[in-house]
């Protein structure tokens, strides 16, 4: 009987400790003030605009700066490319953009202000490597991480929006 009381008390203690630990782990990360959130949102929107400019001007230095070393992107076709592959493709000039613009961007902030996700629309037009005109509209989702004081895009995906 003494053993069962000790076991029951030990089990009760472990259950309470587990419950407290679970509640502690479920707490949100450090809260971000509204001013910090607004600054992060503005910064991510600016980076999206720079990304569009990179394609318009074939400026790989922008992408070198804003894409993380392990960056991966999935295009509407399902084709996947890394940072190195995306920059190499822009350097070869396979496509020449006359339009490259992101719009309707919504930014969400997570992880105490260290992670952001932006969702928006993207319109691009120009000529492909064979001189054939193209025009595409897509909706994108990008994941940004704050590391060493700078925002870097680690992953993105675009889905085609049919033109009417």
Model-predicted regions and their roles:
Residues 2, 12, 26-29:
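Compositionally biased, low-complexity segments enriched in small residues
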Residues 25-65, 72-164:
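A beta-strand edge to alpha-helix "cap/lid" segment located at domain peripheries
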Residues 1-7:
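N-terminal secretory signal peptides that target proteins for export/translocation
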Residues 7-9, 161:
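Alpha-helical and His/Cys-centered functional microenvironments
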Residues 10-22:
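Bacterial N-terminal signal peptides
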